[in-house]
Amino acid sequence: MADKDKKVKKKKAKEDAPAEEAPAAAAPAGDRQSSRGSRKAKRTGSNVFSMFSQKQVAEFKEAFQLMDHDKDGIIGKNDLRATFDSLGRLASEKELDEMVGEASGPINFTQLLTLFANRMSGGSDEDDVVINAFKTFDEEGKIDSERLRHALMTWGDKFSADEVDEAYDQMDIDDKGYIDTTKLIAMLTASAEEEEGGEAA
């Protein structure tokens, strides 16, 4: 009977040992790999945040929240369409597809920052940033002054009505309420250059 007990114990130990050893050996390797991958992903995300000031990140966050119409934490094609609609501009399916296609995956907040960082590191200078910002409002070389006023008083560093009025006093606005885009950009970029020149002196 003792021999039988020994055989059963030996058999049981033999069956249990490989089953316990295999997962134990496989688990740490899998854990190490996934934790390394997640740490790398976290580092990549945090590198994007370090490219911007806290104020800029807060402004991007505000813009992201305004664009995320369905509040699911991801900007999709419908969110982009609704954003353009709220600006009074119709975006074609092709434009929307191209915008969504620029991202390497779903556009969450970190992905949005990454897209901006890629654009900014792509050699865009301040003038290009200004020009691209006004393309959203540009209607064949003109900007509707009321739409621009609304945007200036609603998004980002919100301007007061007095501040917008003061800026509009310096702009050339036609009888129909349109601002010449080229003149506006020239005025803004010249003002920025004057400020930089004044700081250097």
Curated annotation (Swiss-Prot):
User: What top-level branch of life does the organism fall under?
Assistant: Eukaryota
Q: Which residues form the EF-hand domain?
A: 55-90, 125-158, 159-194
GO terms assigned for molecular function: calcium ion binding
Biased composition, class Low complexity, residue ranges? 20-29
Q: Where is this region: Disordered?
A: 1-48
Name the Pfam families on file.
EF-hand_6
One GO term describing the cellular component: myosin complex
Residues that coordinate or bind Ca(2+): D68, D70, D72, D79
Q: Which UniProt keywords apply?
A: Calcium, Metal-binding, Motor protein, Muscle protein, Myosin, Phosphoprotein, Repeat
Output the InterPro entries linked to this UniProt entry.
EF-hand-dom_pair, EF_Hand_1_Ca_BS, EF_hand_dom, Myosin_RLC
Keyword match Phosphoprotein: yes
**Where in the sequence is Phosphoserine found?**
S46
Give start-end of the signal peptide.
Answer: none
SMART domains to which the protein is assigned, alphabetical: EFh
Assembly, in brief, is: Myosin is a hexamer of 2 heavy chains and 4 light chains.
PANTHER family given for it? MYOSIN REGULATORY LIGHT CHAIN 2
Misc: This chain binds calcium.
Q: What is this protein called?
A: Myosin regulatory light chain 2
Give the classification, highest ranks: Eukaryota, Metazoa, Ecdysozoa, Arthropoda, Hexapoda
